[in-house]
Amino acid sequence: MPPAHHGSGGRRRPGRGNKGKRDTEAGMTASPDPGYMRPETHAAPSQQTDVRSPASAREHRNADVGVAAPDALTPNAGEQKEVEGVAKVNVAVSSDQPPDWAPSQSDLPPSLSPTTASRPATSSRSPRARSRHSPVASSSAFSSPAPSASALTSASGVPEAPLAAPELKHTLAADEGNPEPRLEGPVERLHARQENPLTDSSDGSYILLEEGESQRACLDRKNRHLRQTTPPGVWTTADLASQNSHSASFASGFRRALLPSGGSGDHDEQASDCRASLRGMQRPCFGSPSTDTRMGAAEGLPLASRRRRQHWRRELRAFGAVALACLRASWHGMKRARLRATRWIDRNAATVRVACYTFLLLVTSTGNTICFKKMIDKMPNYSPCLTQVTTVVFVPVFFALSLYTDYAGGLPQEMADFPKRNFAVMGFLDSFSGVMAIIGAVHTTGTTQVVLQQSCIVFSLLASIVMLRKRFHAAHYLGALVIILGVLVVKLPDLLHPSSDGGGDVFVFNLLYLLSNLPTAVSCVYKEVAFRGVEMGTNYLQAWVALFQFLIGFLVLPLNALPVLGPQRVPLAELPASLWNGTRCLFGFNTIVTNCGGAGNMESPCDNCEGAWKYVGMYLSFNLLYNMFIIFVVKSGGAALTFLVSTLRLPVTALAFCSRAIMGDRAVPPKATDFYGLLVLILGLVIYRAGGIMKRRAQRRAVAAARGHTSSPMMLTPREEEQIGTIFVEEVFAAGELEDGGVTEEDETDDDTSEVEVHPVFSSVVASEPPHVYVHTKRHSHSDGGYHKLPACGSSPAAFTPFTQRMPGTGSESCSRRRNRDGDDERSPRSHACSFDEETGFAGGTGTGRHFSSPGTALSPNRVGGYEPPSMHAVQPAVIGKSRANNGCI
C-alpha cells in the first residue's frame, strides 16, 4: 500500500534511511478482507500554505458545505428519525459500561443532553471525520459525511444515505457567534469507540486500528517530551489526529499510511478551527503554528520559511556552543599561565623583588621630578615657604621610624656617641642646596632641570678628589667631560641666541639651579668621611639631618633677597610676611593679584593658589617613596642599579615634560638640541660607569701581582679569592703594600667580600642620582669606649698585628702579640698557633713563611713596644682633608 502524504509534515527530506522500512511495513499491513479498498494515491501536497484568516476560513468551509450537500441543510423528519434509530442500535451493540477514560454525565456541560451525547458527531471540523482513511472510523458511521465512492454500511449491510447535517449547521453557527468552547471532539471519540469495538470485523480494518494504536503508544513512549499531557480532572478538546500528526513528523511508512493525507493548507485550517474551538480556554491548542514551538514558525509562514528559521536557530546554538568552548579553553589557559607564573616567581623571588624595586624607583624618581616642577609653578612667589614646608614634614616621619627601628631594641652606644655637630654640618649643606634649587626652578623649564641635574656627578668627582684625595680611572674623567659637553649642547644655543620671551628659561635662575648641585655633592662626600668606621642607622641619620636642615633653613632664607633675582627678590624685611602669605596660598588664598604677570619676566607672576596643597602633597608623597625605594634597591640589588635608574630617568622625564597631557600649559615644546643633548649625557654616564669597572679590574690585577699569583687575575673566581686571600689581606694591609685609591661600586655592594657598605640618605630636593653615603667595615668596640676599624688604606694597629719571630735558643717560630687589650703579653709556643682575632678578623699567623723587615711596617720592632689606643689609628669623623703620613690616605 503506497503511503499517503502527511497533512502537516510536508515533504520528507532525502537521506532519512527508512524508505525500505516504509515499503516493508506497507506490505505487512495489507488487509486480508477482499472488501477493503486501498486508499487512492494523491498528488504531493503543495509547498505553499494557504494563508487565511479565521473568518475567510469559515467562509471557505461554508462554501464547501453548500456545494457538497445543498439540500442537506433542510432534512425531513423521516431522515432524522432514521438517523436516531441507527444511533440507538449502535449504542445497544456497544458494551454496557463505558471505558474508564469516558467522562461521566456530570462532567459534560448542560448544553449536551444524553441524547446529544449518544448521537454520532458529524462535524466536519474533525480530521478523522473529514478523511475516509482514518483507522478510528474503520467500519462505522464515522466516515466522511460528504458523498464519496465508499458508502456507509449499517448493521444489516444496506448502504445508507449520507448523514444529514443539522449538527453541522448548528456547529457553524456556534462557531460564528457562540464564544463557548466546543466539546464535540471527546464526545466523537467516545461514540467512535463505543460503536466500533475490536470485535467489529465487518471489513477487517480493526487490524489497522490495533496496530496503529500500538505504534502510536510506542512512539509516545519514545518521545515523551513531544506529548501534551492533560492534567487529571481537566477536560480539554485535544485533537487526537493533530497530536499524532505532529508527534510523528518523521514516522515510518506504516505510520504515515495510517495518518490522514492532505495539503499544507489543511494544517492551517485545522489550527484555525482549533483556536476557534478553544476560544476562552486557558490551555492553548496543541499543534497550532502559533503555539507549536517544535515547528519553530509563526502563523502563516510557509514551510520553507519555517525550515530556514530552524536552520538559523541551529546555527545560533552551534555558534553559542563554539563560543562557550573557546571561553572555557581561555579560562583553563589563563589558570595554567597563572600557575606557571606563580611557580616561576617562587623560584626567582629575589630577582622579581629587585626588578619590582628598580621599576618603582624609576617611577617614583620620575614622578618626584615632575611634581617638583608642578609645585614650583603653582607657588612661584613663595620659595621661602616651600623650602621650609618640604623639610619640616619629614622630621616627625623619620623620628617615628627611628623610634620604631632603633630605640625599640635599645639605641646602640655608637650611634648615641656620634657627634651631633656632624649632623648640623650635613643639615646646613642640604638646606643651602634646597634653597638654591627652589629659587632657580622658578624660571627653569623641566627639560633644562633634567639636564642640569647631571652636573652633580661632575661636582662629586671634584669633591672626592679635593676632600678624599681619591684617584680615579681615566674613564671617569672622560665621562665627566662628556657630561659637561651634553649640558653645553642643550644650553649653548640659548646662551648665544636668547629669545625675547626666554622660553621659560632665565640664565640667572638656570645658573642658581646648576650651582645647587655643588652643596649636594659636598654633603655626600662629607657623609662618607663622617661615617667612616661608624655603623649608623639610616632612619636615625635622616631624622637628625632633616631637623637641622629645617632649623638652619631659617638662617639660609636671606638668599631670597639677592638683587640678581629681579622680580622674585624678597627683601629681608618681608621674609616673615612671605612665609605667612605662602602658608595662606598653600590653603588656596591668593595674595599677589595686582602689579603682576607682566611680559618678559619683568614682574612676578600672579597668585593661582587654588588646589596648591594637592601639588605640594603629591611632591612630598613621591619624595618619601623615592627615598624609601632607594633603600630597598641598594639593599637588594646594589648601588649599580641606582646608576641604571638615573640613566633611564633622563629620556623618560624629558618626554614627560614635553607631554601636554602631563604638564598641561607648562609643557615644553621639544627641540632638536634637547634630544641631542640627552644622547650625549647618556653616553657620558655610560663612560663614567665603565671607568668604575676598569678601576676594579686594575685593583684585582694589583692584588694578584702582590699575591704572586701566576694565573690571569681576570680568571679568578670568588671561591679562589676567598681561599687564597684569607691571610693575604692581613699581610697586605699590615705591610702597607697596597693603596686603596677608592672603592668601586661593585665592591661596595658585595655583601660577602666588600669593605664598604652603601647607605642611602634623605634628600628633600631633586638630585641627579640617589644620594648615599659609604659606611666602611664594621665597628670594633674596645674597653676605652672608642671605636676602631681597619682603614681601607692604612696599616693595622700594633696591638692587633700578629707577626712571626724566632724564639731565643730554639729553632721554632712562635706567634706573638706584644700587648693585648689588657696590656698582657700573649704568646704561643707552636708555630702559626695564634688565635683568631674575632674583632679584627685577622688570623693567628701570616701563614706564608715570609718575614717583612722594612721599617715602618707592622712587623717592625718599634711598632710593638706597647698598647696604642685604637683612636690614634682610626679616621676621626670631624677631620676632613688631612692625609695619613705613611701612605697619603685620610
Swiss-Prot record:
It is a multi-pass membrane protein. Coiled coil: none annotated. GO terms for biological process: amino acid transport. It holds the Pfam family CRT-like. Disulfide bonds join C585-C609, C596-C606. Residues 102-126, 134-156 have a biased composition (Low complexity). The keyword Membrane applies. Keywords: Amino-acid transport, Disulfide bond, Glycoprotein, Membrane, Transmembrane, Transmembrane helix, Transport, Vacuole. One of its GO terms (cellular component) is vacuolar membrane. It comes from the Eukaryota. The chain crosses the membrane at residues 350-372, 392-412, 423-443, 448-468, 472-492, 506-526, 545-565, 615-634, 641-663, 674-694. Its main location: membrane. Residues 1-163, 280-300, 798-871 are annotated as: Disordered. It is found in: Vacuole membrane. Glycans are attached at N581. Nutrient transporter. Involved in maintaining the osmotic homeostasis of the digestive vacuole. Required for the proper organization of the endolysosomal system and, in turn, indirectly for microneme secretion and parasite invasion. Required for bradyzoite viability and cyst development. Can function as a drug transporter. Can transport chloroquine. Belongs to the CRT-like transporter family. This is Chloroquine resistance transporter. It comes from Toxoplasma gondii. The lineage of its organism: Eukaryota, Sar, Alveolata, Apicomplexa, Conoidasida. The gene is CRT.
